[in-house]
């Protein structure tokens, strides 16, 4: 890539650490703050209503209501991400943008989860969400390989009664895997976003990645 010669050698490691720290901090202290940006109980109630409707009506439209709710939340989060990414790009803030970006990503996935009746409080649920984000960031052959493995895991979870109880989960290890996937994919955009004059070019890609992750979350 033509940008390679301009990018500091330590930037990849710095991004890895920034993403890992961002996720760890949000899981420790930030989930409650994120939940203030939407009505969790209302979303749970909507899921119950949609579930009842799908059982009674048993038609395609009632089933689509789950996806409709998830897409509505996704659209809002894309707007938030656009403002956040471009706004900080204008002032050349690439690395400082990462905790905010991570928060928007988690907010989007949380709302998708609630739309389908899932929560995100346990370590098992957090690891699953992190895996969704990780796999969504891969391209081509790597994506196919990781997606197939993830689908196999999901099939096993469903076979076990839709629970991850008893699974060996390592939240810290998954945080690091997700951080590496994000930093590898976003290396060039975060470099651009950190430049005062052309930062907006990097910031434009934040909503692109949020959409990519949200779309993948809807599928899972």
Which stretches of residues belong to each language-model region?
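Hydrophobic alpha-helical membrane segments of integral membrane proteins
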Residues: 97-102
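Structural signature of FAD isoalloxazine-binding scaffolds in flavoprotein oxidoreductases
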Residues: 104-108
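Transmembrane alpha-helix interface/packing and boundary motifs in multi-pass membrane proteins
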Residues: 84-96
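Terminal, membrane-proximal amphipathic helices
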Residues: 1-83, 110-220
């Amino acid at each position: 890539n033509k940008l390679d010669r301009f990018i500091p050698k330590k930037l990849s490691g710095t991004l890895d650490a920034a993403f890992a720290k961002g996720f760890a901090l949000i899981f420790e202290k930030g989930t409650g703050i994120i939940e203030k940006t939407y009505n969790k109980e209302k979303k749970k109630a909507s899921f119950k209503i949609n579930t009842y409707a799908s059982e009674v009506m048993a038609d395609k439209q009632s089933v689509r209501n789950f996806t409709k709710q998830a897409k509505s939340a996704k659209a809002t989060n894309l707007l938030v991400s656009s403002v956040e990414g471009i706004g900080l790009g204008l002032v050349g803030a690439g690395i400082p943008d990462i905790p905010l970006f991570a928060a928007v990503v988690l907010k989007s996935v949380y709302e998708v989860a609630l739309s389908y009746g899932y929560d995100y409080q346990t370590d098992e649920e957090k690891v699953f969400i992190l895996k969704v984000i990780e796999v969504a960031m891969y391209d081509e052959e790597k994506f196919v390989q990781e997606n197939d493995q993830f689908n196999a895991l999901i099939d096993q979870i469903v076979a076990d009664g839709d629970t991850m109880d008893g699974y060996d989960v390592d939240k810290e290890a998954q945080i690091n895997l997700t951080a590496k996937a994000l930093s590898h994919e976003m290396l060039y955009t975060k470099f651009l976003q950190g430049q005062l004059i052309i930062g907006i070019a990097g910031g434009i890609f934040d909503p692109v990645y949020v959409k990519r992750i949200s779309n993948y979350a809807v599928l899972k």
